[in-house]
Amino acid sequence: MSTISDIKLEDYWISPRLGFLSDQPVLTELPNPYYRCWEQMISSVLPTDGWVLIRRQIDQMPLLSTKKLHTEPEWRRAYTLLTTLAQVYIWGEANPSDKLPRSVAVPLREVSEHLRISPCASFASFCLWNVAPVPGVVPTDPDAYDPDNLHIINSFTGTKDEEWFFVISASIEATGGRIIARMLEAVEAVHHDRIHVVNEFLNELASCIAEICHLLERMYEKCNPSVFCHRLRRFFSGSKAKEDAGLPRGVFYEGTDGGGDWLQYCGGSNAQSSLIQLFDIILGVKQSGPGIRRACTSFHQEMRQYMPGPHRDFLAQMEKLSNVRSYVLSHPRHSNLHNSYDQAVAALALLRQKHMIVASRLPHPLAIMASTISG
């Protein structure tokens, strides 16, 4: 069995500086001209046109091989492009399409298999791999991932509201990501009974979550709920449980030989963020009530299928190794360690409350579940 000292963050596509965001620069376009038609399809059809011609144009696209993708940033860029094309094809016109043509469906399934992620839009395609510092900002600058220093590469609507929604999410990822290495140190410290290290970590975690709460409160600075609901939200939609939208069987992903598969997937959602689930894991947080607990566990496990495979692996590994809560409970109830732990759990509960307030104004069917958490 692996120990905490065996974990190398880079093996899980995790940056000590940015967490689940990549240290490798996000590509703004694929370097091989072979894939130019994918890039041109995104850039030539303006969001202000309402995507009215997008299906006809995608239907005419050639089927490209994925064998010319080499680096991980290239695979991620391809995934972002193809999921964007899939969303505008399915949801860009008045009536959703229950078919995804082979020119998108085949390479999307191949790219997703490589990345070990579901072949559909996700938090990774909208946020992790579609947000970067604005030109002129040095990526290693401590303030590079302040929301005002970020921009999105591809957009569904071309609005500042959409961009702000995603850059806030990316800034939250970067803020929380900086504490992941400290989590590993705290888990290791438990084995050596270094109580001061665990206590310091819990205090840092509470401060980190408080900073994330502040970022979440900034959502309304430049994201108008009306724009979000009426122009952007449909592009987050999935193909699962969409009978009312005219997709009773989901979406048919065409294959290379004239066949294909009916597939159903959830839409893109911040519930697919590995960071928030990691906070639960490190604190040993459970949702209160057996029925709620089972529902939340099932929901969280389902959301992991929309995370990059290495991120999902990291969460599974941390579930096996996390020992902070049991260590805290082995100490007196009124100790400083207990107080620090309680403050971290309270900070996480407050974050969920603030998120639910945001979700109520920017409603989406896959918003993070409201729940009472118990440490």
UniProtKB/Swiss-Prot annotation:
What's the catalysed reaction? D-tryptophan + O2 = N-formyl-D-kynurenine; L-tryptophan + O2 = N-formyl-L-kynurenine
Q: In which pathway does it act?
A: Secondary metabolite biosynthesis
Keyword set includes Metal-binding = yes
This entry carries the following GO cellular component terms, namely:
cytoplasm
Required cofactor(s): heme
* Co-factor binding comment: Binds 1 heme group per subunit.
EC numbers on record: 1.13.11.52
Question: Which PANTHER family does the record associate with it?
Answer: INDOLEAMINE 2,3-DIOXYGENASE (PTHR28657:SF10)
Q: What does this protein do?
A: Indoleamine 2,3-dioxygenase; part of the gene cluster that mediates the biosynthesis of terreazepine,. The first step of terreazepine biosynthesis is catalyzed by the indoleamine 2,3-dioxygenase tpzB which produces N-formyl-kynurenine through the catabolism of tryptophan. The two-module NRPS tpzA then utilizes anthranilate and kynurenine to assemble terreazepine. The first adenylation domain of tpzA (A1) loads anthranilate onto the T1 domain, while A2 loads kynurenine, generated through spontaneous nonenzymatic deformylation of the tzpB-supplied N-formyl-kynurenine.
**Name this polypeptide is given:** Indoleamine 2,3-dioxygenase tpzB
What organism is this sequence from? Aspergillus terreus (strain NIH 2624 / FGSC A1156)
